[in-house]
């Protein structure tokens, strides 16, 4: 099992797919990394040599922001939006959709489970 950017890559998967287990690397970025390092995308992780693993590790560390650094940057960007009080920041703060989706119905992912509001009974 190869360890790159603090993530254990599954050894039975192809390198192209295994790299996507790292936060911040998708299929396209994975292909670019493999092309830059000259590693065969169809090779399994268990078949990689130490030299190839170190090439991949070096390429990712030097040219891409991944895992903790990327998560910190995203969180900082959201925090900045909230601090300046712009529309997007307010939507983040309230836990509502940020990109203009409708909220009259749907938007359950952002809003969470329904909070049922019932009528109070009159006391006798």
UniProtKB/Swiss-Prot annotation:
Family statement: Belongs to the universal ribosomal protein uS13 family.
Q: Which organism was this protein described from? A: Dictyoglomus turgidum (strain DSM 6724 / Z-1310)
One molecular function GO term is: structural constituent of ribosome
Question: By its UniProt entry, which HAMAP family does this protein fall under?
Answer: Ribosomal_uS13
The UniProt entry's GO biological process terms, in alphabetical order, are:
translation
Per UniProt, the keywords (alphabetical) are:
Ribonucleoprotein, Ribosomal protein, RNA-binding, rRNA-binding, tRNA-binding
Q: What is this protein called?
A: Small ribosomal subunit protein uS13
Q: What does this protein do?
A: Located at the top of the head of the 30S subunit, it contacts several helices of the 16S rRNA. In the 70S ribosome it contacts the 23S rRNA (bridge B1a) and protein L5 of the 50S subunit (bridge B1b), connecting the 2 subunits; these bridges are implicated in subunit movement. Contacts the tRNAs in the A and P-sites.
- Extract the signal peptide range: none
Cite the Gene3D superfamilies for this sequence: 1.10.8.50, 30s ribosomal protein s13, domain 2
The residues that cross the membrane are none
| Subunit description | Part of the 30S ribosomal subunit. Forms a loose heterodimer with protein S19. Forms two bridges to the 50S subunit in the 70S ribosome.
Q: Which domain of life is it from?
A: Bacteria
The Gene Ontology CC terms held by the record are: cytosol; small ribosomal subunit
Q: Where is this region: Disordered?
A: 98-124
């Amino acid at each position: 099992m190869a360890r790159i950017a603090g993530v254990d890559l599954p050894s039975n998967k192809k390198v192209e797919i295994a790299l996507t287990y790292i936060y911040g690397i998708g299929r396209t970025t994975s292909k670019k990394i493999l092309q830059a390092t000259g590693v065969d995308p169809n090779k399994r992780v268990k078949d990689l040599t130490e030299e190839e693993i170190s090439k991949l590790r070096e390429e990712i560390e030097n040219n891409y922001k991944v895992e903790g650094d990327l998560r910190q940057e995203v969180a900082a960007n959201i925090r900045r939006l909230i601090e300046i009080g712009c529309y997007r920041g307010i939507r983040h703060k309230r836990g509502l959709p940020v990109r203009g989706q409708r909220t009259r119905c749907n938007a359950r992912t952002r809003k969470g489970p329904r909070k049922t509001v019932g009528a109070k009974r009159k006391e006798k």
